[in-house]
């Protein structure tokens, strides 16, 4: 043992010189001559016969006597493996970490004593840990060596044992510069030619298995550890280090990762269930493995380190993935943004129905950017299903284009207030160009806004029936759908309640078709004074299409205000307006002037069957500019109907309701009359003159009726208010079973000088139930009596001396005591309360005095 140190030192020098100077062929021959067994002492490390074998062993003693520079040369050039416990230089670390990057830390930092622990056991544990991730498949042939050669990799071990020793010098010489960052693509070929050092060590290790003795000294064990480090460093094919490597390997792992990612043309290495520490080691060797291995290295579930690479390529994959974004139906919000990038193109080419189903709100914004193009090309039905409210705003942007292509009337139904402004801008174009159907089914409120955004385009194309299904209008919604009754279609099926105001908001624009009465839907949008663009189209000269968006504030309009406002206020107050509820839509068919008016409960439904005059109960009030030109006969016809409606009007339940009903009486008359003004008739200019003549007459009559109705309703309203007050009082009394205190204003005051008995009789417990003023002592007769005792109120006695009784006031003392008792003792409904009631009667009898 004493001489082994210098001997190993000498052998180490020779080995280093030989590896550096001799050609690869000579070195291979020397290696193959049997020097390997002693060189690769595995666990026991039997003493080798030759000096070179001992030098290859790289004993700790040799290192202890070597300078760092010599160690670097010998170790790095000869074996390319650095035992970190003996190396103090960062360059050594760089060589090792960059070159093989998978030295177990356990061996890097082992002291000689630490190395005495069973190397084979550590190797086995470490080997098993590395096999766990699933890399053991590379070298099942070497599984038998795991116990002894714990750090040997599995891959290609058995195949290359013959060539290991001969290839080793060449490999080492090339590996040394590579450790410093010289790993380049050109060296991949060299790596492929070279058998991984692991295999070289395996070859020697197997020869050493026969020579291993159990009597290995500590120095042998240190050598074994030393070579184990080298074996494990050279373990390129095996991903055995992916097992339980510590976090210090992370840094080395990432050094090689650059090469790995550059050369990874195949699948990203999906590493199985390796932990984060495994990922970093696994990726150290992955560069080499992937450089040599262009086939798929399918390692199950890729860990987080793979994800970063995977995402690098994902961008390209997503850029090429143009097909998946086509499903606009139930796409989630994250998909919407990409999906809609391509949607514009698809929608531009889509001349058929673009059935957009339940697109979410985020889809709507992008989807509708391109929708303009789609709708310009979309000559067929644009069946837009359940699109939400957010689409409305963008839809109107493109409506102009769609409406410019349409040539016929576009009957717009229920447009929201915000849509009124835009809708009217494009409505002129839409009404000029409307040719085809825009079949919009059961669009909800949110659908109305979108549907009608695009309806401009659809309705402009709408010569046929625009079968707008049931438009569901929510009362008091400012944004009610643009369910415009398009192209003179009957929205017969549209039983839209409360749509009257909305449906008619936009319909006022030249829905006057030659053969039919114009479907003028006059919309009272709350607080909207936007009046129509009287569009009279060429031969279909319709009545002025005015969109009367007037405030239906019926409760606040006084009779005087109605008269001053002309017919505008009256129309706003049309019988359809109950309080703030908008009346249902009025839809008139082209061939039939019948109105299908489904009204809010309490509203009068008028189905006027005039083919010439669609007897719509026009919501808007007609100022002279707003009034159409219906024939006089139609004016009178509606006038009669108005009178019929006004007659049965009954006063509202209270205050605001009364006001709305009163106004309804006058406004219904005017509304229907005004509605008739806006119905385009088959007669053109001749009838317009007739309409003009009838307007002045109607105005006068309407004003008269309005004044009369206001006068009639005023007394009724007042009477009704009184009745309601009385009813409320009765209800309050009914709710309080122990109501006592009478109302002093009720007029039931006892006459002056009345006896206590009389007052007691007047204010018995039964009588006290009538009163709603509750105080303590609900049944207490004292309280009742005292509150009603006029004698006490007029008593001239000295209040300070209540003990005295005056002749005029006989009950002062009684009334004085009563409140004290009630406040202190008497609880409503309690025993004392009942007792006090009985006591009251007794006292009343005792104090009873005959009247003077």
Curated annotation (Swiss-Prot):
Composition skew (Low complexity), residue ranges: 44-58, 746-757
Annotated stretches, region: 10 X tandem repeats, acidic: 199-470
Mod. after translation: The N-terminus is blocked.
Record's subcellular location: Sarcoplasmic reticulum lumen
Protein name: Sarcoplasmic reticulum histidine-rich calcium-binding protein
Main location: other
Modification Phosphoserine, positions: 120, 518, 544, 614
Pyrrolidone carboxylic acid carried by residues: 28
């Amino acid at each position: 043992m004493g001489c082994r140190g210098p001997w190993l030192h000498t052998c180490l020098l020779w080995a280093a010189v030989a590896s550096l100077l001799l050609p690869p062929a000579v070195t291979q021959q020397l290696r193959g001559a049997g020097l390997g067994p002693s060189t690769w002492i595995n666990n026991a490390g039997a003493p080798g016969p030759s000096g070179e074998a001992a030098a290859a062993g790289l004993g700790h003693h040799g290192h202890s006597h070597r300078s760092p520079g010599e160690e670097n040369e010998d170790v790095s050039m000869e074996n390319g493996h650095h035992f970190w416990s003996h190396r103090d230089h960062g360059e050594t670390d760089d060589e090792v970490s960059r070159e093989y990057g998978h030295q177990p830390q356990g061996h890097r930092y082992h002291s000689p004593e630490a190395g005495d622990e069973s190397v084979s056991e550590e190797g086995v544990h470490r080997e098993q840990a590395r096999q766990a991730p699933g890399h053991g498949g590379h070298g099942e042939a070497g599984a038998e060596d795991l116990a002894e050669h714990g750090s040997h990799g599995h891959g290609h071990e058995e195949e290359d044992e013959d060539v290991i020793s001969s290839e080793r010098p060449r490999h080492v010489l090339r590996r040394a510069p590579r450790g410093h960052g010289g790993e380049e693509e050109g060296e991949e070929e060299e790596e492929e030619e070279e058998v991984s050092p692991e295999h070289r060590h395996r070859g020697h290790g197997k020869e050493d298995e026969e020579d291993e003795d159990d009597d290995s000294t500590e120095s042998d064990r240190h050598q074994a550890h030393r070579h184990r480090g080298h074996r494990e460093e050279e373990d390129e094919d095996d991903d055995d280090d992916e097992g339980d490597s510590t976090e210090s390997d992370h840094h080395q792992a990432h050094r090689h990762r650059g090469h790995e990612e550059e050369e990874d043309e195949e699948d990203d290495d999906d590493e199985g269930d390796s932990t984060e520490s495994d990922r970093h080691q696994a990726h150290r060797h992955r560069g080499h493995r992937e450089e040599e291995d262009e086939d798929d290295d399918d390692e199950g579930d890729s860990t987080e380190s793979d994800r970063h690479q995977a995402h690098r390529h994902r961008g390209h994959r997503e850029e090429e993935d143009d097909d998946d974004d086509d499903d606009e139906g139930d796409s989630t919000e994250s998909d919407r943004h990409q999906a809609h990038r391509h949607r514009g193109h698809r929608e531009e080419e889509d001349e058929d129905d673009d059935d957009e189903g339940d697109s979410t709100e985020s889809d709507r914004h992008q989807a509708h950017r391109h929708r303009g193009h789609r709708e310009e090309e979309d000559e067929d039905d644009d069946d837009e299903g359940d699109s939400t409210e957010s689409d409305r705003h963008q839809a109107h942007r493109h409506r102009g284009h769609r409406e410019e292509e349409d040539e016929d009337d576009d009957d717009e139904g229920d447009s929201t207030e915000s849509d009124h402004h835009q809708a009217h801008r494009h409505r002129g174009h839409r009404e000029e160009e409307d040719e085809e159907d825009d079949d919009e089914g059961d669009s909800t409120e949110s659908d109305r806004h979108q549907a009608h955004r695009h309806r401009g385009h659809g309705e402009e194309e709408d010569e046929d029936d625009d079968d707008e299904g049931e438009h569901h209008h929510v009362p008091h919604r400012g944004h009610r759908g643009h369910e415009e009754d398009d192209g003179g279609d009957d929205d017969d099926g549209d039983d839209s309640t409360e749509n009257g105001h909305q449906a008619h908001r936009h319909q006022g624009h030249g829905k006057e078709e030659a053969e039919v009465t114009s479907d003028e839907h006059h919309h009272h949008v709350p607080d909207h004074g936007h009046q129509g663009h009287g569009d009279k189209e060429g031969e279909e000269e319709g009545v002025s299409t005015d969109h009367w968006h007037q405030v239906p504030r019926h409760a606040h309009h006084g009779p005087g205000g109605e008269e001053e406002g002309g017919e505008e206020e009256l129309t706003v107050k049309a019988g359809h307006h109950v309080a703030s509820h908008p009346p249902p839509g009025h839809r008139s068919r082209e061939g039939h002037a019948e109105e299908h008016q489904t009204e809010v409960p309490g509203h009068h439904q008028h189905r006027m069957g005039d083919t010439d005059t669609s007897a719509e109960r026009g919501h808007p009030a007609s100022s002279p500019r707003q009034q159409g030109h219906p024939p006089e006969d139609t004016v009178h016809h509606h006038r009669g109907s108005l009178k019929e409606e006004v007659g049965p009007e009954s006063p509202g339940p209270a205050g605001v309701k009364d006001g709305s009903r009163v106004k309804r009486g006058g406004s219904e008359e005017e509304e229907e009359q005004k509605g008739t003004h806006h119905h385009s008739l088959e007669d053109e200019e001749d009838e317009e003159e007739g309409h003009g003549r009838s307007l002045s007459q109607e105005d006068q009559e309407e004003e008269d009726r309005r004044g009369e109705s206001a006068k009639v309703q005023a007394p009724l309203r007042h009477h009704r208010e009184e009745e309601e007050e009385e009813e409320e009082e009765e209800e309050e009394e009914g709710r309080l079973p122990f109501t006592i205190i009478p109302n002093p204003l009720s007029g039931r005051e006892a006459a002056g000088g009345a006896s206590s008995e009389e007052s007691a009789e007047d204010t018995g417990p039964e009588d006290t139930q009538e009163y709603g003023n509750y105080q303590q002592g609900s049944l207490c007769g004292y309280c009742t009596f005292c509150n009603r005792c006029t004698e006490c109120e007029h008593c001239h006695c000295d209040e300070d001396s209540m003990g005295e009784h005056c002749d005029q006031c006989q009950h002062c003392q009684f009334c004085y005591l009563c409140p004290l008792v009630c406040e202190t003792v008497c609880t409503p409904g309690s025993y004392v309360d009942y007792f006090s009631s009985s006591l009251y009667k007794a006292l009343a009898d005792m104090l009873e005095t005959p009247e003077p």
